[in-house]
Each structure stands twice: as structure tokens, then as C-alpha cells.
Amino acid sequence: MNNPLDTTLVDSAIRFAVDAHSGTERRGKGFPYIIHPLEAMEIVATITNDPEMLAAAVLHDTVEDTDVTTEDIRKTFGERVARLVVSDTSDSTLGWRERRRGVMDRLARSAWEDKVVAIGDKLSNLRAVYRDYKQGGESFWSRFHAPNGKEDYEWYYRELGWALIDLSETEAYREYMDLLEKTFGKEISAPHQIDIREYEESGAGYNAVSYNYRYGKTMVKMYREGVDRAVPEQELRQSRNVRSLGLNTPLAGRLVWDGKRYGAEFVRVEGKRSFARAISQNPEDLTLYAERFAYLCKELHNTPCSQNDFESEVDFYHRIINQNTDYSASEKQRLHEFVNQVPVEYTCIHGDLHIGNILTANGKDFWIDLGDFRWGNHWFDLGMLYFVCKCWAEEPVFELFHISKVQMAQVWDVFARIYFSTDAPGTLSEIERKVRPFAALKLLHLKTLGLHYPEGDGMIRKELLGEL
């Protein structure tokens, strides 16, 4: 039999908070102020049943907004409750931004329990903001004291989201981030300045380097110098859109800048490694990961994709062909014709499909590097995978995927059998014949980006232009 929960401390804290806030009204709401602390406590209760944390949640505004002192809380409820209450209290003598900046800086470095108490308060506030904004529209923001109205509140609530990042696995945090998007939209604000010395490199690709933050649960993908901020902005926006489709991907955060490079910030996936890294560390598991990748790709390619949030792969390749300067007008026309004859599909494609762009951790898999995510025919995606598995040279394969070209070819062989549900040699050979022009098309894309490969032009001319 379970022992009954001792609610003595929480009951006492509720009565204390009711008395402290007696006669006060939640500003502009028309109901007693105590409703807010009670809601904050209810939110905290979705994360923990620790009585002292629940007590601190319902008491969080007593020191800041009433005559109650920290010493009163300490004498009545103990040292830990008093400390938790003070951790969620701001300095009323400071200006609007300075006061809130102090709260966020403190929260970012606080213990987990401080953040749990804080999210009860902040989520309750954001719920109220969202409800009132829906009713009042843009005129709602004029009711507040922030010098710059909505701009200040957007800054504040977005920054709070990252100060509370340690709670990213909780339902309360997910609700907070969802309301943040509904209230302020998906737009990326000014880049957040980071000190790259506070980060540890965790991986590198052909145009970006990934880092883990040493003092928190974030990771950043920093693009090479000279890459416009629009590229990481696109990746952040695409990542949010992909997540809304129900596909698993790390939670997207802020646009960042280290003084030389722009980057995209994400919630770090603890214990992560890519399928490529997993194979390099445990070569005996190659078949397991290649099969798993095939099933994940089948799921991806069967997911209906929003034509409003993502670009068509056909439109994308028409643009790439037009941008290329290495081919004549008649050759470009033949390339356009190839793209046009591909049957139309309205499902998701990754755009940069390979075993380095899927992470695994604690039994979960996460799609990453989603800047090229689009909708269209799955053969476009398979062309990229075939190229890196079967066509690329040994050196770039090992540099990016940490396995040999022979192993990479084995990945395709296993993948194709599972993805197409066949072991028939003739059918598999026909699949390779069909996918090679799409691999050549991906080479055309890479060539347009300034990434030249010895096998590139010859493959494009053979597979797409019919030259021997």
C-alpha cells in the first residue's frame, strides 16, 4: 500500500498565500490575485510532488508583491522554501529590461528545482498573455509598462525559454514553447551573441561545425565564415516546421553569432551520436543501423508535407539549374525536362539524406540538418543517399562519416533491400539504374554551391545529358 501524501506544508503555504494576497486583484483580470499562484503551483505539480517546491510555487509572489519578508517565509516554512521563493523574485528598483535581465541570468545558472518553481510562474503568465492577446489583438500590448511594448515582451519570453532549457523534456516546457510561437510567431529575432570558448566542438560537416555548450543543455551549429545569416535562419524555421509535422527533431532555438560566424542553436540531445558515428564505433552493427535508417526514411517519405511551409523540390531544382553557369542553354533545357518528368508527390523529403543527419540517443532517433527539407518525390532524396554511399571518393566519405567507402556501399545495399522490400538482384540493379540520375542531380546542386568533385561533371553528363 502506498503511504498517503503528507500535504501539511502545502496546505499551510496555500493558506499563507491566500492571506498575503487577500484583497488584491490580478491586474486587468477581474479575479483574485491568488488564482495566479495557485495555477503556478498546479504547473509545478505536473513536474514534481516535492512539498517544499510546491509550497515555494504558491508563495513565489509574497515577498515581491506583499508585506511578507524573506525572513517571514524562512521562519514559517524553512530555509529551502525561502531560498526557492527568493530565486523567483526580481529587484523592483531596477529598470524594466535590467530587472528582467537579472532574472534570466540568474535562472540560466540556477539549480533544476529553481527552474521548476520559475516555470510555474512564467507559464501561468504566458497563458494569460496569450489569452488576452487573442481577445485584444495588437492593442493589448499598450496595457503594459514595457518601454517598447510587444518587442520587449517578445525578447523577455523568448530569452526565458532558453534560461529554462533544462526543463525541455517536461510537458510544461513544451506548452511554454508552443504558446511562445502562437503569441509571437516563428520569426527569428536579432542574433544572440555567444562566446565560442564556452563551447566544445562535437562534429564537422562540409559547411558547418557543431559545438556543445559546456555549461548547459544547448548545442550550436556554426556555419563557415561568409555564410549569410539567412542560412541558419532557414534551418531554424525548417526545424520548427518539421517538428510540427510530428517528426522527431531537436528543439530549435535562437539564431547565434560568435563575432565571425552565424549559427543555429538547439536543445542538446544528451548522449547523442549519428548513425554514421555509431557504425564507425561498432562496425558489427552496420546492418542494424542501415535497416533502421531505411524504416525511418520510409516513414519520412510517407509523411504528408505542408506546401505552405516548405518549398517544392521541383521548383528548387529548376532554380539550381538556372543558377548554374557550366552548361549551355540547350543542356539546361534537357535538365529542366528531366526534373519535369518526375511524378509529383506531396510527401516529405529531407533534402540532404544520409546517415550523418540522423541522431540516436536513449532509444530515440532525431532528424537534423533540416535547412534543405522540402516536399516532392522520394527519388530526389534517394539520389543524395546513393551519391554519398556509392559514388563519393574514399577521402570525403571517411572525413564526414568516419567509415570506409566499402562500408558506405554496404549501407546502401542493406538500405535498398529494406526500403524497397526486395532481395531480387535484378530488381536491385534496376533501382540503382533509376537512382543514378537523381544522384547526378544532387551533384549539380553541390556544384552550384561551389563544391566540386572529380566525379561530378562526368556523372551529370552521362546520367542527365545522355553523353558517354
List each model region and its residues.
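Active-site helical microenvironments for divalent-metal-assisted chemistry
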Residues: 1-188
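An alpha-helical support segment within catalytic cores of ATP-dependent transferases
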Residues: 188-192, 302-351, 355, 361
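ATP-binding glycine-rich loop module of kinase domains
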Residues: 205-233
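Active-site acidic catalytic loop and adjacent metal/ATP-binding pocket
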Residues: 208-215, 336-380
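Short beta-strand micro-motifs within the conserved protein kinase catalytic domain, predominantly
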Residues: 251-262
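Short pocket-lining segment of the protein kinase catalytic domain that shapes the ATP-binding cleft
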Residues: 264-272
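Conserved kinase catalytic-core helix
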Residues: 272-311, 332, 338, 342
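Active-site activation/catalytic loop segments of kinase-like enzymes and analogous catalytic loops
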Residues: 382-423, 438-455
